[in-house]
């Protein structure tokens, strides 16, 4: 489904933009699902940031029957589940989709620390430019050799000694609703401005197989961490994580396969 060029851009630079991957109708439907569920979970869109919120915002695992598009994008849709395998060059295992209303900026960071890797599909639900919170990335920063150089760069920049920081060379990714950005989980990224910002994201990790128990455990822990927002105060029965998605897998071959992999890993009972 993806072109050779798109796959190679992702592997070389750590990201690729997929313009119009969602139709206008799908983009509108996804925004409506995200806005409705966040408002129901937290009372408003964009609660005030707390003292220990990290990248401030409201985060909600979104895999309920009330949000059918978000539910189907996890593993029913080849544009996400199959595309993740094409980008990574191996079978994958999904996390849950996450509805987010960002209420602050983020500094340079990666989405994952451990040496597992993976891909995130990021959908901003309003138009985003440099001045309104578009994703900023450092191309190639997912590669271990470049990452080591960036750590050296960061260690000697003025901010490390309490002075004004350097502006790191980067690319701003302008998007409109319907566009999806595929991001390697080790790519350095940040966002600035445009708050509150509505988005929907999902991560896919490489399927580790069953021979390496340590790697299986690492993937399991990452998947569980991705959906356990312990700092968030919402009704876990109304937004139960995996339950409704897994219960509806019968007859959907790709979802059944994803459920089987998650059970082998110990993510699902």
Specify the residue positions occupied by each region the protein language model found.
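Non-heme Fe(II)-dependent double-stranded beta-helix
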Residues: 1-12, 19-115
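Non-heme Fe(II)/2-oxoglutarate
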Residues: 33, 46, 187-269
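Short, structured patches in soluble enzyme cores that scaffold and shape functional sites
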Residues: 98, 110-112, 123-127, 137-139
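Short edge-strand/loop segments of extracellular domains
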Residues: 102, 138-145, 204-209
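A short beta-loop-beta micro-motif enriched in histidine and acidic residues
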Residues: 107-118, 168-169, 175, 193-196
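Short, surface-exposed loop/helix-turn segments at secondary-structure junctions
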Residues: 109-110, 155-166, 214-222
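Short, conserved beta-strand element in jelly-roll/cupin
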Residues: 114-130, 174-175, 182, 203-207
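Double-stranded beta-helix
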Residues: 130-190
